[in-house]
Amino acid sequence: MKFGELYMNGGAVVIDGTRRQLLPDHWVNHARTVVANDAVTETQYGAHWWVWPQCENSLVATGYEGQYTVVIPEKQLVMVRLGKTDTSLRPAVMHQLQQIALKVTNL
């Protein structure tokens, strides 16, 4: 969650009421710079993050055994999905997360 919040806040955290920039502010934007497309999942890859083209400015981290962190800064949203998922079910889990993200971004 904290990792997602770091990116949601443009690379900054608030400690004792003081905003501190931990990452250069341009780095978060760089993370969204698409360097590859995945035609199977209809996602794009940036700098160490996946990007969902249908959710503008999203950042998505995929982790071990089907864990996900989804960041949509404009909606102040960080979704974290912890749980073990069989490989065959992961596309369905990702699709469900995308549907949630789309509903939130269209509010």
Model-derived regions, located:
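Arginine residue identity/basic-tract feature
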Residues: 19-20, 32, 81, 90, ...
